[in-house]
Regions:
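Catalytic glutamate of the conserved HExxH
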Residues: 101, 105-109
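Active-site rim/adjacent substrate-binding subdomains
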Residues: 1-97, 109, 115-116
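Post-HExxH zinc-binding segment in Zn-dependent metallohydrolases
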Residues: 114-124
């Protein structure tokens, strides 16, 4: 899948979110890379080929009243293209996995724990 096609699926996933969630996506950027770099691997405590996505930043649930009073760098959601592609056999599987990873990382952005994200994805 081309990078452009991959990014289009990410955009569609975000566009199809319920409005109440979409409106909360503030000061966050989505970054597509083939693999995580050393800093991201250290943060996630995993191997290069196992990580499909990673959220870095201050989750919404932990932002205090002073958040945004001063310029802040955007939170980042990394989506690791080559790792996701490696886990899928068909294009349909790939599309579903991209959507799942994007939703998973948005869950962390919203402040959900790993267990909460996994439960929410079962119902989505």
């Amino acid at each position: 899948m081309t990078l452009k096609e991959f990014e289009k699926i990410i955009e569609e996933t975000i566009e199809n979110l319920p409005d109440e969630i979409k409106q909360k996506l503030d000061n966050v950027v989505f970054i597509v890379q083939d693999y995580p770099d050393d800093e991201e691997l250290k943060r996630a405590k995993t191997s290069k080929h196992n990580l499909l996505g990673l959220y870095t930043g201050i989750p919404l649930s932990k932002r205090g009243t002073s958040y945004g009073m001063y310029p802040t760098t955007p939170d980042r959601i990394f989506i690791f293209k080559a790792n996701i592609e490696r886990t899928c056999k068909t294009e349909d599987e790939l599309r579903k996995k991209i959507k799942e990873v994007v939703l998973h990382e948005i869950g962390h952005y919203l402040g959900m724990s790993e267990a909460e994200v996994r439960r929410a994805l079962k119902n989505f």
